[in-house]
A protein has these predicted regions:
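A short, flexible beta-alpha/helix-coil linker loop
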Residues: 16-19, 60, 119
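Hydrophobic/aromatic residues within transmembrane alpha-helices
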Residues: 44, 56, 105-107
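Conserved CoA-thioester-binding segment of acyl-CoA-metabolizing enzymes
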Residues: 1-45, 81
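Short glycine-rich anion-binding loops that position phosphate/pyrophosphate groups of nucleotides
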Residues: 17, 48-50, 96-97
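Crotonase-fold acyl-CoA enzyme core
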Residues: 82-159
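Hydrophobic alpha-helical membrane-association signature
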Residues: 26-30, 72-75, 105
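Catalytic-core regions built around general acid/base machinery
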Residues: 33, 75-87
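Glycine- (often His-adjacent) and acidic-residue-rich active-site loop
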Residues: 46-79
Length: 159
């Protein structure tokens, strides 16, 4: 991850040429950057192909204990709250796909800018058997119109 400050704006480049998966480690790094910032705004960037493909499903499948699964989801929840609680605007520049947890990260931001291209954005959790916790549903319902909420969450429609 590459972090720098320009004109009181913290710019966080998730910095991987791949899917920018939100592992517990990466989520904690992002939380730290959001929690300890004296900047006026934060910009979060992925790469030109993928903003973030969400949680690392290998981490979930390798979790042996319920507490390990809880740690993964709780850390993602903390990251989303850190975006919401940041005193200035958090801006996600979505230059590529934003799927599942990556879409949640973009939705938790105050502003989302989609870059030109054939990229997908959506929540596929229900399609793969993952129930969204209430705090994540709250973020979604504050960011997506009521007209589209059902198809986004339960039908996993991609945009």
């Amino acid at each position: 991850m590459n972090v720098f400050v320009e004109n009181d704006v913290k710019i966080i480049e998730m910095g991987d040429k791949g899917p920018n998966l939100l592992s517990v480690e990466r989520a904690k790094q992002l939380i730290k950057e959001l929690d300890y910032s004296d900047c006026k705004a934060v910009i979060i960037l992925g790469n030109d192909k993928v903003f973030s493909a969400g949680l690392n499903l290998k981490d979930l499948s390798n979790a042996k204990e319920p507490k390990e699964v809880a740690l993964i989801f709780n850390t993602l929840g903390e990251l989303l709250r850190a975006c919401r609680d940041f005193p200035g605007p958090v801006i996600s520049i979505v230059g590529g796909h934003a799927i599942a947890g990556g879409c949640l990260l973009a939705l938790a931001s105050d502003y989302r800018y989609g870059m030109h291209g054939m990229h997908r954005m959506g929540l596929n959790e229900m399609a793969i058997g993952i129930d969204l916790p209430p705090d994540m549903l709250s973020i979604i319902s504050h960011s997506i119109s009521r007209d589209n909420l059902f198809e986004v969450v339960t039908q996993c429609k991609m945009y």
